Amino acid sequence: MGTESGSDPESSSNGWSRARGLVVKTLVLIGGALLIKRLTKSTTRRDHARVVSRSLTGEKFTREQASRDPDNYFNIRMLSCPAAEMVDGSEVLYLEQAFWRTPQKPFRQRLYMVKPCPKELKCDVEVSSYAIRDAEEYKNFCDRPKDQRPLPEEVIGDIGEHLTTIHLNCCDRGKRCLYEGSTSPGGFPNSWNGASYCTSDLAVLKNNEIHLWDRGFDENRNQVWGPKEGPYEFKPATSSSINENLSALNILYQSSIDKPIQGSLILQD
């Protein structure tokens, strides 16, 4: 009795299963690689702008730095919160700085506009600062209930003189910062304390820490205001700093004598 010629059906089935499994694995690997590539590319400049805006928002202090180097740095309270949104999606933040003992008396009030860098520029986020037309109306803006603040449309109408613009880029891997940047080399016009122009450096670190270095220079490039040793290091408020701040507020509100703070202010611009 002779044997039949041809392939074994079971062997053919196993071979096809292995081939199909190999194809599926290959497709999964390719799909995974494409997904990772897509996710990597999905972070847009607008996403970066949102991160920077969130990092700037909140209550921060330079308490640690002032304790470490009291001769060169004050303990400053910086408070910022969203105030409006422009038609193009740019976020407008209200920002004020005050000595930690007198948080209700800010010495600096600004509107910051945070938006993605224009396509023609090699940067990720653009941060511009503006004066406020009626700054008195905005004192302690972020501490007030929302129904007691100027309306968003009023905020936009109160955007005053353009002061500075900083272009931020994502920090290289291995650095402490997330974003860093500065004003253009020539800075921006400024006349405070004998200055002819000012510069500003900004770094956004992890945990919403902000390093800000504002300086003024005269026509001969001599620095006439601002810290010389390095930027102010603003760190998010801790429970202890909040308690100290509340104690300071209670003392000030109970006191009928308004004593001026001694010392030269190096943050004004």
Swiss-Prot record:
Signal peptide: none annotated. Induction: Transient strong induction in response to cabbage leaf curl virus (CaLCuV) infection at an early stage. One of its GO terms (biological process) is regulation of cell division. It comes from the Eukaryota. Disruption phenotype: Abnormal organ morphology (e.g. pale green, reduced stature, crumpled and irregular margins in leaves and floral organs, and shorter roots) due to altered pattern of cell division and differentiation. Impaired plastid division leading to enlarged chloroplasts and the formation of cells lacking plastids. Reduced susceptibility to viral infection by cabbage leaf curl virus (CaLCuV). Its main location: plastid. InterPro entries: CpcT/CpeT, CpcT/CpeT_sf. Changing G31D: In crl-2; impeded plastid division leading to enlarged chloroplasts in mesophyll cells and abnormal plastid homeostasis, thus resulting in preconditioning plants by activating the expression of stress genes, enhancing pathogen resistance (e.g. The keyword Cell cycle applies. It is an enzyme of class 4 (lyase). GO terms for molecular function: lyase activity. One of its GO terms (cellular component) is chloroplast outer membrane. Mostly expressed in shoot apices, to a lower extent, in leaves, inflorescence stems, buds and cotyledons, and, at low levels, in roots and siliques. It holds the Pfam family CpeT. The keyword Cell division applies. The chain crosses the membrane at residues 19-36. It is a single-pass membrane protein. Covalently attaches a chromophore to Cys residue(s) of phycobiliproteins. Required for plastid division, and involved in cell differentiation and regulation of the cell division plane. Maintenance of plastid homeostasis controls plant preconditioning to stress and stress acclimation. Belongs to the CpcT/CpeT biliprotein lyase family. This is Chromophore lyase CRL, chloroplastic. The gene is CRL.
